């Protein structure tokens, strides 16, 4: 069905084709808001550049083809940088159904065996890395959907190396702990997402992620072999240990009883925590190490996904037609897709039709049929 080959990126009707992929990626690099991003805009770009530098020729050929990258290593890095931030800016569902995919709330007193229980229904970062990388490796993908799958893998591997994306002290991964510091951050999680990475960049260069990436590659070059891909659960556990030791314990934050599904926002410290110069210097070093590991491991994962170069039959051509969107006026008789989780429905060209996770979709023949089952139209569907 033609609709399955379409991937909507924006809140309008932006339909990705090979002809406009580069424009989409360029706009993502220039206009993306920093505050919304895990690891921050620059953190994800650093991971992507390191990974691009360490891909095998076989893996690089597939990545370049899927992302429509410009020629050369620099073009590949630019495309991966831009793709790395899309899951935070353009692939969000209207009802935020994908929000839980970016982290796993492991309690500070959890054991390694508790990981499965912290990922209900496979809706967490570890499960999604496994799911999307497997789909890419299976090879039975439509090239248009592969763009989204690859962007998610690039992004999620970065996320899982941010320590507070794999830890919670009944505080939503540090989101409930205000900070007292010279850096611009409202809470501990935000401090680790962006300002700490920016400090790291300015300590190396004038705030350029590409330069920072190359510096980190050299600094941790001896660890590159050791940082081959390991199961996502193992990485989550490793990041959790970093959070325990270098964030919570270092700041003398008490350990709260395990409450991973808590709706309330608790500050276990009972006060704003001070991030002084000594702590920030230590945090810069830890963040740099985590970003380097993420980049090396992302490259290792993609090298495992694609061990053979892309074949000519798999190479997209500029003449490949892009499917035309179905007009909203035809929605009453077109395909209606509902989100089981949010009970919202949409149709091609409106709402979150092409952003709904495949395993979360239900198809209805008409709008009336959807509404009879208790579904409501997405806000921007007329």
Go through the PLM ranges and name each one:
Residues 27, 103, 345-346:
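Bulky hydrophobic/aromatic "packing anchor" residues in well-ordered structure
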